[in-house]
């Protein structure tokens, strides 16, 4: 059975989440969306937000079965980072997540290629925002 693109992406996120959980990370939220209201379109999304030892990890999951469109990591550019940072700023002002406002955070990129997970810790910085 072949998976469609959405199913493969969802399965890949679960593989990455399992890997983080095995390393004693705690899941805060999966697929956090930045929306101003329920009728407006999505303004941002973070695949996984995790916590370990007081640090917050923002994880972008990229999954591919081939390199037809070039290396997966190349798809996380400055615009994508701005999108993630904007979403993170929205995340920390939400009532249930305010306790994380003072926490140090980092961005990890998780690449799933042919069902193999590779995590690139601290893959990029938010210095230019």
Task: Identify the meaning behind each predicted range.
Residues 3-6, 14, 63-115:
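Catalytic cores of nucleic-acid endonucleases
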Residues 55-57, 108, 118:
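Protein kinase-like catalytic core scaffold
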Residues 46-67, 84:
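Conserved catalytic cores of phosphodiester-cleaving nucleases, focusing on short active-site segments
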Residues 51-52, 100, 105, 128-129:
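Positively charged, solvent-exposed patches that mediate nucleic-acid binding
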Residues 112-129:
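Short, low-complexity, polybasic intrinsically disordered segments
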Residues 1-35:
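Acidic-basic catalytic patches of nuclease active cores, encompassing PD-(D/E)XK
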Residues 26-56:
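Active-site metal-binding core of divalent-cation-utilizing nuclease and nuclease-like domains
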